[in-house]
Amino acid sequence: MSIEVKGLRKEFGSQCAVNSISFSVTQGEIVGFLGPNGAGKSTTMKMLTGYLTPDQGKAFISGVEVTSDPLTARKKIGYLAEQNALYPDLYVREYLSFIARVQQVTTIEESVENIIELTGLKPEAHKTIGKLSKGYKQRVGLAAALVHNPAVLILDEPTSGLDPNQLVEIRNLIKAQGKTKTVLFSTHILQEVEAICDRVIIINKGNIVADSPLSKLANTVSLPRAGMSLEEIFRHLTGQPEPF
């Protein structure tokens, strides 16, 4: 398994943010990680990437246990955080070259130019990051996650701030990457899940309430009626009343 989670638990004071969850994701699989705000999505992703230590349980990236060997695990991961920390005074190429050096990429210039082309950054590559629109800043974050050609992509809200045209381009990029990589991404845009994902994991109040191929989701959970949409299933599983 490219991503394997075994009994991960994280508490903040008296609040249990992630409650002993387990799941796995294989190579070539794109999995949507869904849940309302505060459900535990970002906390889980931070534990998977070694930025937060679990209180219990273990996470493995391509067989490497994250807590015991975080540096090796991170080299196998491309991570786009929800709060995408960038350096506003650096030029796009300069920043991506810096990330490539940190990731010990051997062909830095070639890798940077390839990823600029792949993520559609070429028209803005001559600018400093601080002068970019929110959508292009998001592309820079995605390019930084991809520049070292990782086996696993963990993307927290990767389409946030994109206009409809950019959204389609990034959607297609994620789908293309998912053919050879392992992709776990969170989003609040359920249409993105339907367009991109092979499978969906829904988390609510720190607990996994659904884990199923998208096409079989309605058959694997208890629902009040047949023919419910993904949005209706999501609302039902996360305790939201149906709209009138």
Describe the residue ranges of each PLM region:
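ABC ATPase "signature
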Residues: 211-212
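A short, surface-exposed alpha-helical micro-motif characterized by mixed small hydrophobic
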Residues: 193-195
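Conserved ABC ATPase "signature" region
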Residues: 97, 101-124
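A short, proline-enriched helix->beta-strand linker immediately N-terminal to the Walker B motif
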Residues: 147-151
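Conserved ABC transporter NBD signature motif
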Residues: 57-68, 72-73
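Catalytic Walker B motif of ABC-type/P-loop ATPase nucleotide-binding domains
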Residues: 153-157
